[in-house]
């Protein structure tokens, strides 16, 4: 992991230094995924079973996980694990419940009322990756907001065999539709539906290059499903001053570096001594990490940057837009108003990135690869949709009609204009008739 002095670089060199590792999908992945998606659409469950056997080297007895299997998985877990998962569930639920919005009702002018109401997305699909270790935390991050939002149907897919921890957390989140399928075939099944797997409106969750490509393809097809956000490799950026603990910084950088060879970690500090001590601490801590080889590969594209000031650190961070941003300075809270682009921010010495990954309450599904400029961390709103309502009285329409008529004429949309004027004419006729009735009665 190299150390550089920011001011010693030209603008082009500075820009090049902040380039993320390239995402190498390749035409072959695109073609493979397209074939898988088409196969699942055409042959449904039969294709799912064959593809699962081909890619995961196992043919499940049943595509759907039974209630008995979930109960058995729960019984196999230790009390310690259950308690940890329950605590994480409570914290995540508490934070996401607080994100509920109240209906909005505004009278924009006399007789014109506008409202905004929220409804849950009817059906959602959650993808939980397989791999060497189970990811119950991802089930929590997706399942809890889906549950709180009130999504009527929640489908969960994960490669077989599904870990006990995943099944237990699914139960905590009230998820009963769980399927033994993974990879791009699972994304296709949720996007288009099969005899066993229900079609969903939106798909959430991380995955490898094949899963990411499948999500991209189905989201670009109007017959497919929406997705949560673009995905990329994990990343963390740390802003530190002279009060920061180098051991803490090193641990935080390595916690992201161990995710994968394509992860990127960055330190920004105006203190050369901090950069040097962090570099030493990284080498010491690497010696005891089981995933040290993976972390070393990630460190190859990672950097320790020495700046002139903390203000310069903030400027660089805002330009880079990290997935995770850790602020270890004397007064970290004071920097928050100055930070514009980050997925999730961790303030102070006692807020390691790991707590956000698991149990602080915030969501760990975050935009990466610079998408923090336009995307937000996953939250309750992602499992909901907003509808607007307007209601006008007759007097309200009369007041607003000239504005609408003028604008419709300017845009050459006569039917729009007519939808207003036909009502105004009807009102005028009613008023004339009413006046005549009054005159007749008085006579």
Curated annotation (Swiss-Prot):
The keyword Metal-binding applies. It catalyses: L-histidinol + 2 NAD(+) + H2O = L-histidine + 2 NADH + 3 H(+). One of its GO terms (cellular component) is cytosol. InterPro entries: Ald_DH/histidinol_DH, Histidinol_DH_CS, Histidinol_DH_monofunct, Hstdl_DH. It is an enzyme of class 1 (oxidoreductase). Pathway: Amino-acid biosynthesis; L-histidine biosynthesis; L-histidine from 5-phospho-alpha-D-ribose 1-diphosphate: step 9/9. NAD(+) binds at residues 127, 185, 208. Substrate binds at residues 234, 256, 259, 324, 357, 411, 416. Catalyzes the sequential NAD-dependent oxidations of L-histidinol to L-histidinaldehyde and then to L-histidine. This is Histidinol dehydrogenase. It comes from Photobacterium profundum (strain SS9). The lineage of its organism: Bacteria, Pseudomonadati, Pseudomonadota, Gammaproteobacteria, Vibrionales.
């Amino acid at each position: 992991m190299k150390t550089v002095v920011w001011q010693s670089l030209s603008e082009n060199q500075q820009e090049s230094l902040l380039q993320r590792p390239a995402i190498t999908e390749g035409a072959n992945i695109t073609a493979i995924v397209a074939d898988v998606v088409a196969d699942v659409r055409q042959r449904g469950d039969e294709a799912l079973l064959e593809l699962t056997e081909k890619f995961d080297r196992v043919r499940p007895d049943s595509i759907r996980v039974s209630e008995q299997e979930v109960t058995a998985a729960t019984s196999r877990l230790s009390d310690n694990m259950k308690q940890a998962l329950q605590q994480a569930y409570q914290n995540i639920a508490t934070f996401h419940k607080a994100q509920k919005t109240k209906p909005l009702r505004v009278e924009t002018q006399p007789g014109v009322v506008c409202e905004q109401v929220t409804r849950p997305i009817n059906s959602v699909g959650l993808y939980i990756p397989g791999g060497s270790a189970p990811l119950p935390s991802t089930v929590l991050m997706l399942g809890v907001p889906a549950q709180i939002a009130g999504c009527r149907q929640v489908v969960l897919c994960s490669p077989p065999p599904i870990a006990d921890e995943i099944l237990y957390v699914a139960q905590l989140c009230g998820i009963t539709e769980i399927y033994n399928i993974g990879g791009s075939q699972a994304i296709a099944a949720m996007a288009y539906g099969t005899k066993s797997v229900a079609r969903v409106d939106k798909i959430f969750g991380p995955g490898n290059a094949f899963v990411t490509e499948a999500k991209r393809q189905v989201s670009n097809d109007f017959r497919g499903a929406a997705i949560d956000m673009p995905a990329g490799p994990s990343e963390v950026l740390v802003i530190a001053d002279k009060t920061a603990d180098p051991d803490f910084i090193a641990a935080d950088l390595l916690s992201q570096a161990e995710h994968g060879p394509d992860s990127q970690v960055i330190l920004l500090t105006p203190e050369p001594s901090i950069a040097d001590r962090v570099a030493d601490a990284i080498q010491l801590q690497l010696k005891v990490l089981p995933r040290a080889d993976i972390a070393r590969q990630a460190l190859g594209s990672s950097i320790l940057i020495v700046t002139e000031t903390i203000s310069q650190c903030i400027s660089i961070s805002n330009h880079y837009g990290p997935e995770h941003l850790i602020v270890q300075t004397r007064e970290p809270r004071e920097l928050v108003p100055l930070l514009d682009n980050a997925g999730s921010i961790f303030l102070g010495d006692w807020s390691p990135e790991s707590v956000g990954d698991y149990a602080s309450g915030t969501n760990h599904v975050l935009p990466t690869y610079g998408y923090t400029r336009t995307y937000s961390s996953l939250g309750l709103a992602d499992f909901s949709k907003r509808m607007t309502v307007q209601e006008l009285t007759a007097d309200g329409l009369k007041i607003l009609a000239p504005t609408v008529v003028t604008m419709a004429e300017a845009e050459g949309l006569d039917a729009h204009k007519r939808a207003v004027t036909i009502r105004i004419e009807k009102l005028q006729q009613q008023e004339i008739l009413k006046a005549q009735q009054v005159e007749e009665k008085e006579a």
